Amino acid sequence: MDQRGRQKQLACLAALLLASACGDGNAADERGIGAQCTGNDQCNVDLQQVCLPFKGGYCGEMGCTKDADCVPDSACIRHTDGVNYCFRTCADKAECNANRDPANEANCSSSVDFVEGAMGRKACVPPS
């Protein structure tokens, strides 16, 4: 293969790698809601996210009183521990675990207490 052919091949490979890196993420992915963490510095502190005390950690916010307190693609959930958290919303389990390892998978569940009502939604619930 001549040099020009190699350049074309490398250009195609670079384009393919860039396209695969873009993903199908939503606002919650971009903001890190639901991501696994071990400390607050791994969460989006500009958006007041903290590493919540769940198994594997969970980047989110606590103390919300309504969905508007949470970033887009997340909702205010009254957890069984009595605290309100902003958890990412989901359609299926895969959406919950893009940024979590298999040992700390979250579940996409409709069996949570949405502060403003479920309205057919589900949320990514981290393991306890």
Task: Specify the residue positions occupied by each region the protein language model found.
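Sec-dependent bacterial lipoprotein signal peptides
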Residues: 1-20
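Secreted, cysteine-rich disulfide-bonded mini-domains of extracellular proteins
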Residues: 22-128
